[in-house]
């Protein structure tokens, strides 16, 4: 996916599942690019929020949200009295990633504007921009022909 908005790129990287070749979540790789102390604290928090259950598959601890939530519910159903099998504990990393995305969105007005539009509005905007590009192409073609004469 090619996103031109920097904040949307960051959100996209945070929400991506674990990169299997690096054996660490893309969210951590994205956070390593930031230099502020606040982001380093968030990375430490994210690391501390990972489930400590060794029987959890590695893809579910940092992977996509839905499989992670279903696995957490399965663990709770399997052993409801185990303190480490609480939904809050097992889904802590998901909540943290979503809060991080929410804060990124709330801090940037351009991102709010982009995300506030409906798909039908985007179709209209895309169509309008395609028309503008076609007009610009036509003008450039006319200029090129005039230069060739």
Curated annotation (Swiss-Prot):
A cellular component annotation (GO) from this entry: cytosol
Motif (Nuclear localization signal): 77-99, 136-149
Record flagged with keyword Nucleus: yes
CDD domains attached to this UniProt entry: Med9-C
Keyword set, alphabetical order: Activator, Nucleus, Transcription, Transcription regulation
GO terms, biological process: negative regulation of transcription by RNA polymerase II; positive regulation of transcription by RNA polymerase II; positive regulation of transcription elongation by RNA polymerase II; positive regulation of transcription initiation by RNA polymerase II; RNA polymerase II preinitiation complex assembly
Primary location group: nucleus
Basic and acidic residues composition bias: residue spans: 25-45
Chain residue ranges for the region called Disordered: 18-64
Compositionally biased residues, Polar residues: 46-63
The protein's role, per its UniProt record: Component of the Mediator complex, a coactivator involved in the regulated transcription of nearly all RNA polymerase II-dependent genes. Mediator functions as a bridge to convey information from gene-specific regulatory proteins to the basal RNA polymerase II transcription machinery. The Mediator complex, having a compact conformation in its free form, is recruited to promoters by direct interactions with regulatory proteins and serves for the assembly of a functional preinitiation complex with RNA polymerase II and the general transcription factors.
Subunit structure: Component of the Mediator complex, which is composed of at least 21 subunits that form three structurally distinct submodules. The Mediator head module contains MED6, MED8, MED11, SRB4/MED17, SRB5/MED18, ROX3/MED19, SRB2/MED20 and SRB6/MED22, the middle module contains MED1, MED4, NUT1/MED5, MED7, CSE2/MED9, NUT2/MED10, SRB7/MED21 and SOH1/MED31, and the tail module contains MED2, PGD1/MED3, RGR1/MED14, GAL11/MED15 and SIN4/MED16. The head and the middle modules interact directly with RNA polymerase II, whereas the elongated tail module interacts with gene-specific regulatory proteins.
Other comment: Present with 1364 molecules/cell in log phase SD medium.
Family label: Belongs to the Mediator complex subunit 9 family.
This protein's name: Mediator of RNA polymerase II transcription subunit 9
Gene coding for it: CSE2
